[in-house]
């Protein structure tokens, strides 16, 4: 599996990198959380902008983003506007989504930006190019909160993300059975073994899929989300547990 270097962090190499989500609604609460996260044992902080009360105000987003960058110091900053269709909090038009992405890219504050595979559609390659021109790595994401697609479909989707130029394909799916969790892990292993051009980020959601968030080094998921107190998705595991288990399951 290849490696994506960002701020001295080598995503895809060794222990899965840990992401902490900021899900607070006000700027004051967001910045307070960022200051607390800056000292925790994690590699990356995700700001879920769709949960921000002022998400529709580009100026407020830019101002908050600049303050976040300072507070987080050398921790990676992943910026995400999760659309309602993919489990987020606010409806956003296609044009509004594109404007948001370009606003973030113009700030020089984000290390990584989440671009939804289906929301971006045919604009995905151009958006990836814009991000790379701005020096920002792309997490290209797809979420299914109802089911787990067949393995071949999951692999095909992540390969399509790679072909569009994404640095980190991300797939989150909901299991309805134990077999679904195994299907997600098998898709992850296939990407690692047969499509190693990029690292991938995968997870099976909910309590049934929680194990998939902890065994990334064995199966090939390069990053995992931990719950620092408030989860941003079902099945996220507490930060202390994540760090303990990731250390226990080290391959080297």
Regions found by a protein language model. Give the residues of each.
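Generic structural motif recognizing short loop/turn segments at the entrances and edges of beta-strands
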Residues: 2-7, 14-17, 198-199, 219-221
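Short N-terminal or domain-adjacent regulatory/targeting segments
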Residues: 1-5, 238-241
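Active-site beta->alpha loop and helix N-cap motifs at the rims of alpha/beta catalytic domains
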Residues: 3, 10-133, 143-147
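Catalytic alpha/beta core domains of metabolic enzymes, predominantly
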Residues: 112, 117-252
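A generic local secondary-structure boundary/capping motif
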Residues: 7-9, 213
